[in-house]
Amino acid sequence: MKRTYQPHNTPRKRTHGFRARMKTKNGRRVINARRAKGRKRLSV
């Protein structure tokens, strides 16, 4: 049986990357929340 997670960097960056987050209002909210929490990595 084929596993569900087949990693590829391009779609990963496109959907969860920093630039993708900055495109939307809610994405920016995610980044700010992670900054406030003190996350080492803000995005993928």
Swiss-Prot record:
PROSITE patterns: RIBOSOMAL_L34. GO terms for biological process: translation. The keyword Ribosomal protein applies. The keyword Ribonucleoprotein applies. Keywords: Ribonucleoprotein, Ribosomal protein. One of its GO terms (cellular component) is ribonucleoprotein complex. Belongs to the bacterial ribosomal protein bL34 family. This is Large ribosomal subunit protein bL34. It comes from Helicobacter hepaticus (strain ATCC 51449 / 3B1).
